[in-house]
């Protein structure tokens, strides 16, 4: 299917977002007397559904291309062009005997589906950071969206990946919900199709440009400005940005934790005792608890190394969906997330009452007090004016040794655990993020399970992780 080139959202023009977001849905085949037929039917259903989705939304089957600029220190333009008649679907048989390194459904269940058993190199069609994993094919076209169906003993793992310059997790989930509809023979509402295919220019409103806005924006803008060394000023912008976000491979490690519904309710109740806002959410409380706990685990190392001193700030970067702050429908399948920052001294971070910190987090996302809409309009305005889009990044001032960045997918659980894609497998028993190269200080709260459980995957250097796992307060609340 041929289509004219499709533009990306302006905030998707940043080169460092040339990565993939992965979600793996784990389906059980236990007690299925027709398992072989079900496996084949599942693959056929997904293949037909992807073709149907592309007929409604042609760009979903496209590829992202980069048009370099001839001007120095200019990152060029990224856009979507025609590629296939449907997004790629890979089917891999990973059952015992075919690939001994693949987990079985029994093993996954026994260990509560840990990230460490779900290797992106095995179960995902594209790795998170292209070229960062040994063996990754750099010459492969950059797909907008792709799916891999993995056959394992006792189940099926379906991994969906979305290219992050095109869509954030909320946008990717909307694409998956539309795929779920067509796989089940349902129609996608016309309004959702029109919204998906709308021109991206102008989605984010312009700034008003008054003095009050400028003052509010100054600190947030500084957090997202990459400081390019003078020696690098004449290098290619995209190459410099790629080097800037190169992951820390060692000695950082990933680990999985879980918080039961009962534990989360008790943690929130404890936070409410010291909260300055009675509107704090479970997500606010859990994110604040994670920030405090990790900072506490790092504190002895940081103080011993005098980096930082007790008065130097530690920062929590919290990814936020900006749609509702800009009056953009939640069903918009593009890229509209931003980040808010919370900085305190090392001593303040570990000693502050949990409820006070959770209340601070609430103020930044409460629509009545939040400035996320303003921050996002300012981000778009800066990017429109900046020749080198790589000079603006949410992680520009991120120090992985003492800061953390958290993306919460917990609120997507209701949607994720309700999607069966017409495969005849029922709903997933678990939804996870596959493991990828270590990036110290990065974490995700996973989609909330129907039983109330929320999982956490976090990457820390080994010595900090061991301290965290042994921390009495941490162990009290985690599974």
Regions found by a protein language model. Give the residues of each.
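Short Gly/Pro-enriched turn/cap motifs at secondary-structure boundaries
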Residues: 136-139, 246-247, 394-396
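Adenylate-forming
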Residues: 24-29, 146-150, 255, 260, ...
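Hydrophobic, mid-to-C-terminal alpha-helical segments
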Residues: 276-347
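Helical lid/core segments from catalytic subdomains that handle acyl or acyl-like groups
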Residues: 335-417
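Short amphipathic alpha-helices and their capping loops
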Residues: 2-6, 66-90, 193-269, 314-320, ...
